[in-house]
Curated annotation (Swiss-Prot):
This is Thymidylate synthase. The lineage of its organism: Bacteria, Pseudomonadati, Pseudomonadota, Gammaproteobacteria, Enterobacterales. It catalyses: dUMP + (6R)-5,10-methylene-5,6,7,8-tetrahydrofolate = 7,8-dihydrofolate + dTMP. Its EC number is 2.1.1.45. SUPFAM superfamilies: Thymidylate synthase/dCMP hydroxymethylase. Catalyzes the reductive methylation of 2'-deoxyuridine-5'-monophosphate (dUMP) to 2'-deoxythymidine-5'-monophosphate (dTMP) while utilizing 5,10-methylenetetrahydrofolate (mTHF) as the methyl donor and reductant in the reaction, yielding dihydrofolate (DHF) as a by-product. This enzymatic reaction provides an intracellular de novo source of dTMP, an essential precursor for DNA biosynthesis.
Length: 264
């Protein structure tokens, strides 16, 4: 994951000081891309320990179309708590948009089911896309989508995916985002009888919060270790039937956790 450390270093050295919604302040660059060949290992940051339970359960929660934190709480995941209301609701965030996008004519569009159909029936299509950026519902969301738009691509029997992330918290958020979408590519590839290709991450406003700079320097002082391997132990009937127990990460040997505050 040297690419990730290189991005941190670039933002520290070249980033523009900017104000932000949270009032914390950032160093920011605009426009950056990283490519991860998923055949080379699972792209999970090794220079600090990442909370795998949160990454996996959050993705399963998205795939279920859920937008209430109750499921996350049942599985000891608290990463969305700061934005939930008193009932645990977040409004029409990722799960709602992925599984039940509200069309102008009243239809509810399951974008992920459409993606699976396209990959099986027309894998050369340039329209195999999921968007979470529903302009008509942004004001109802507890947090506007950061990872907003992703596209699948098939070549030589391999499935690749590119994500556009309009806003990226490099220290806390990005390791989760990379691992989450890499996991999704593996799951979709299994369901569509494809091998995995590349995960391409593209960032818009890509930033380090000012209260993460000390932690960033600590992380940059550490040497990356070998990437782990993802093992999917079962092939369920559909993309929406995976369970936490279906996944195993082999050979993950990270440096210790580095704690940092969340900018809300």
């Amino acid at each position: 994951m040297k690419q990730y450390l290189d991005l941190m270093k670039k933002v520290l050295e070249e980033g523009t000081p900017k104000a932000d919604r949270t009032g914390t302040g950032t160093r920011s660059i605009f426009g950056h891309q990283m490519r991860f060949n998923l055949q080379d290992g699972f792209p999970l940051v090794t220079t600090k320990k990442c909370h795998l339970r949160s990454i996996i359960h959050e993705l399963l929660w998205f795939l279920n179309g859920d937008t209430n934190v109750a499921y996350l709480h049942e599985n000891k995941v608290s990463i969305w708590d700061e934005w939930a209301d008193e009932n645990g609701d977040l409004g029409p965030v990722y799960g709602k948009q992925w599984r039940s996008w509200g069309a102008a004519d009243g239809r509810q569009i399951d974008q992920l089911k459409n993606v699976l159909t396209q990959l099986r029936q027309d894998p050369d299509s340039r329209r195999i896309i999921v968007s979470a950026w529903n302009v008509g519902e942004l004001d109802k969301m507890a947090l506007a989508p950061c990872h907003a738009f992703f596209q699948f691509y098939v070549a030589d029997g391999k499935l690749s995916c590119q994500l556009y992330q309009r806003s990226c918290d490099i220290f806390l958020g990005l390791p989760f985002n990379i691992a989450s979408y890499a996991l999704l590519v593996h799951m979709v590839a299994q369901q569509c009888d494809l091998d995995v290709g590349d995960f391409v991450w593209t960032g818009g406003d890509t930033h380090l919060y000012n209260n993460h700079l000390e932690q960033t320097q600590l992380q940059l002082s550490r040497e990356p270790r070998a990437l782990p391997k993802l093992v999917i132990k079962r092939r369920p009937d559909t993309l929406f039937d995976y369970r936490f127990e279906d996944f195993e990460i082999e050979g993950y040997d990270p440096h210790p956790t580095i704690k940092a505050p969340v900018a809300i």
